[in-house]
Swiss-Prot record:
Cysteine pairs bridged by disulfides in the record: C89-C92
PROSITE patterns in the record: THIOREDOXIN_1, THIOREDOXIN_2
GO molecular function, one term: protein-disulfide reductase activity
Annotated compartments: Plastid, Chloroplast
Protein name: Thioredoxin Y, chloroplastic
Statement: the UniProt record of this protein carries the keyword Plastid: yes
Residues annotated as catalytic: C89, C92
Entries under Pfam families matching the protein: Thioredoxin
GO CC, alphabetical: chloroplast; cytoplasm
Amino acid sequence: MAAFTSTTTAAAASPTPCRPAALVARSSAAPLRSAAPVVVAAGLRRAAAPSRRGATLRVQAKKQTFSSFDELLEKSEKPVLVDFYATWCGPCQYMVPILQEVSEKLGDKIQVVKIDTEKYTSIANRYQIEALPTFIIFKNGKPCHRFEGALPANQLIQQIESALEVAK
């Protein structure tokens, strides 16, 4: 999993997905399960760490390992927001602090999971990920809402809340 330390200062007023030719050209006939266990970062938390200038915020991600993506969705007691990303994707890196903020604001309403599309290509193919970042909200193990592109925190929260309201 990518570390939660990279940040960018680019701002996006509207969704700006990356569409790499390699992802678009990928065959959808790939196997549905990856051979390696799925490792995700979930339950983003902020912790105070002392410094000379006062407290510094440090993000801690709770890493969990599942034998399959389906197991992760099946065992989740709350809706799951999956961020399909790549380490080379600028808008994906822009979303790192935004996802942290959203996770903090929504608390126990939703579980945030990040899936590296380069590492887990079979999962990306299964959900036909062609643009990055792509977000899919799963409720009861099934996708209920999907959107693409980098969004400010307030718009991301609106997307999540409206999807959860419709899915009730």
